Amino acid sequence: MIELFVIKDTEWLELVAESVSLEGHRYQAPRSIEATIVTKQGDQTYYSVSEGDTVLFKWKGKELFRGIVFARTPDEHTLAFSAYDMLQYLVKNQDMYVFSNQRADQIIRRIASDFQIPTTSIANTGHTIKSLVIKNDTTLYDIILKALKQTKSQTGRHYQLYSEKGKLGLRAWPDPSEVWVLETGVNITGYQYSTSINDTATRVVLRRQKDNKTYKASAKDSSGLNKYGVLQYTETVTDDINQAQLQQRADVRLAEKKGVKKELKNIQAVGIPEVQSGLPVYISIPEAGIKKTYWVDTDRHEFKGTKHTMTIDVVEKNTMPEGVS
């Protein structure tokens, strides 16, 4: 079932694969594989790979990955290697830029051209960014995310970088009307689910210093106070905002922090190649009271022989994590 090739100028050479792991992380480019191949068996030698080679992985005849070998661990009879798709070049390279009156897609095309990264379809993002100044050396990936974040704040449209057949692309973030279903007793073999109030707040207090005065805004969860007692979250705000905006932020913080926090992770299941980070999946775990759609945050697919399993972590909302550009 595993088909693994090293692509040369004039031919594809098939590798003797023992196992392949394919993984990805939402908002953490790129996707990657770790593979173990047989290079020698008795007097018989087989094709191998070197750093910089392009490898292609297929499962049941469908291409799931194409990327560049970055690391190898040779052994007497086998070789383990890691390969990354084209988004690796956005992470590995840094630069400083000044963009004026450019759309995010135009910024991507400029960066790809400067760093000789081949491209496929790049969606027109519509919104013109008046100015984007990158004064310090910053990864190309973070520069692009800054442009995409500004675009989303102005248009509400969400875009995704991807790698396809060795080329960098940009598309509207997929939100399919039909999603895969994972269910205990059907295709889920294990999971970790926990609930906690360790990070819960029943009262929020924000403070801001200005002109030797302290401005304060607070919000409380009356139901939570009665049930869990006082669990106060405090924050000093440095942004230049007025009292109404300070109160609004306090209300937002309370909405984020009130109630019991639920965490669903390490979901182990029968492998489905299409279940990848950044895509929605419907999860049914009746014994935990879970029947809803989540977004895949991380995915790791394991292939060996004819067996395919996967482990995923999920999030409830497909929002940019704090700290992302």
UniProtKB/Swiss-Prot annotation:
Q: Which InterPro entries match?
A: Bact_Kbp, YQBQ-like_dom
| Record-stated family | To B.subtilis YqbQ.
Q: What is this protein called?
A: Phage-like element PBSX protein XkdQ
Record the organism: Bacillus subtilis (strain 168)
Report which gene this protein is encoded by. xkdQ
